[in-house]
């Protein structure tokens, strides 16, 4: 399972780097999907979220007996699968312009995270109810956290 968790960390890191490079400029155009965000705001938020993802992965690896650690990790896995579709894929289709994060979302996050989830099912580590509830809870927390991180990023960045 260590390799699968490492692949998750690799995938989310590349995805967040893609977003960090191009999303701040992309967000400046009028859109229903994203309010304009500065590089400082976004970079701060994406670093914190990446750190939380790594913490969830390491928590699962080092505390395999902890249901909470497992739920947070599978919540991140599921949330990042959904994130590839909404907003990235839907924004690209609706706006007829590439939304940063789509490529890594479709080519890395969906297959890698789906593989990790599949392996967890094979090893009887999770059931559907845990995956669905964890994805919803972690997804809602991340959605609520993002605007707060943007505000903090604006304050702490030079």
From Swiss-Prot:
The chain crosses the membrane at residues 42-62, 71-91, 102-122, 130-150. It comes from Bacillus subtilis (strain 168). Coiled coil: none annotated. Pfam families: HXXEE. Its main location: membrane. It is found in: Cell membrane. Keywords: Cell membrane, Membrane, Transmembrane, Transmembrane helix. GO terms for cellular component: plasma membrane. The keyword Transmembrane applies. The keyword Manganese does not apply. This is Uncharacterized protein YrkK. It is a multi-pass membrane protein.
